[in-house]
């Protein structure tokens, strides 16, 4: 990650409106990963990441920041929900599985990079296999291949293959047979299932089977097979583990849902126990994965929660100490809603315009129409449950319902969505609190 904090914030601004503090905190944390890697080895081990706790109501951009960050980071990244985990010893996923899943993500990322690096060599080998099927090499009476006879023809076919002229021709090829092993285990033991499957698949002898397919599909299959031959699995494992340990990022959503609210007695397997299990992973421990042992000392953890019922102080004191950077995300205003409808690269109004354009219907949202949509969403949020920007999806779906249904019969029309159009479509629902509670 060589992007500066300003560049990271600018990239996030293209998709997320407002929340400057959260964007800055995330950008600094991401840049610090790069800064740390420039330090001498002995000092690098001492610099630990400053984990982040994002606090804010639902629908203000916490999860969206995580999604966009994953694309920017180009590093092993996983987003999980705290409510999915249970305390060790109970049925359900253990928190260690976060690191195992992160290692799997890293392995996939490293494999993709290795395949990309060897793409040219793999492409040539895959093309040779296709050409061997199309033009079996001529052999002399002793079984030796005579290359000179059909070399020019082979080059002609290779040119046609690269230009896509042979894409739809069907051929029969030998492909590696995938051995599928189905293992039934009780709920919460998915990790054991995947390990047993890997074990049995590794023990079974590699076989090939003949398959008939189009050349363009065969080329993809062979490209994957040839690329797999060019990479060293052991090297990949080492690179994947190093990538997790040095650059891994874990985003834990809904952390407020595992807080112990007030004086509560009795078994509570999904709350305080999960917090206790999270402590060693965030602080730094070693987790056994199928790719090897992973140290979590330098993995960056970003936690988020609405904290509408519980408060950050309801978290275990030890866990609070391991999340030193606190960022509060603000509730969205009517002006924020207007910007969300128009400013992001794939804004909601743009999505609807392009969707209707496929039916030959032109949609135009006027400025006063957008203002009225934003006002309607904001008012419904105030009067009922505040679900932030997600309310815009509900309001727009209600507004576009008739157009979406009749679009195929209105080809060639231009529909202008102005203040009057929005008022007619939404007024009854917005004004009636009981209706808006159930419909919007």
From Swiss-Prot:
Q: Which GO terms describe its cellular component?
A: HslUV protease complex
Task: Tell me where it resides.
Answer: Cytoplasm
Entries under NCBIfam families matching the protein: hslU, PRK05201.1
Quote one Gene Ontology molecular function term: ATP hydrolysis activity
The protein's job, in short, is:
ATPase subunit of a proteasome-like degradation complex; this subunit has chaperone activity. The binding of ATP and its subsequent hydrolysis by HslU are essential for unfolding of protein substrates subsequently hydrolyzed by HslV. HslU recognizes the N-terminal part of its protein substrates and unfolds these before they are guided to HslV for hydrolysis.
- Entries under SMART domains matching the protein: AAA (SM00382), ClpB_D2-small (SM01086)
Q: Which UniProt keywords apply?
A: ATP-binding, Chaperone, Cytoplasm, Nucleotide-binding
Region Disordered: start-end pairs = 141-161
What Pfam families does the entry give?
A: AAA, AAA_2
Q: Where does ATP bind?
A: 17, 59-64, 253, 318, 390
- Assembly description: A double ring-shaped homohexamer of HslV is capped on each side by a ring-shaped HslU homohexamer. The assembly of the HslU/HslV complex is dependent on binding of ATP.
Its main subcellular localisation, reduced to a broad class, is: cytoplasm
- Renumbered to this chain, the Polar residues biased-composition regions fall at 143-155
Cite a single GO BP annotation: proteolysis involved in protein catabolic process
Q: What is this protein called?
A: ATP-dependent protease ATPase subunit HslU
Give the family this protein belongs to, as stated in its UniProt record: Belongs to the ClpX chaperone family. HslU subfamily.
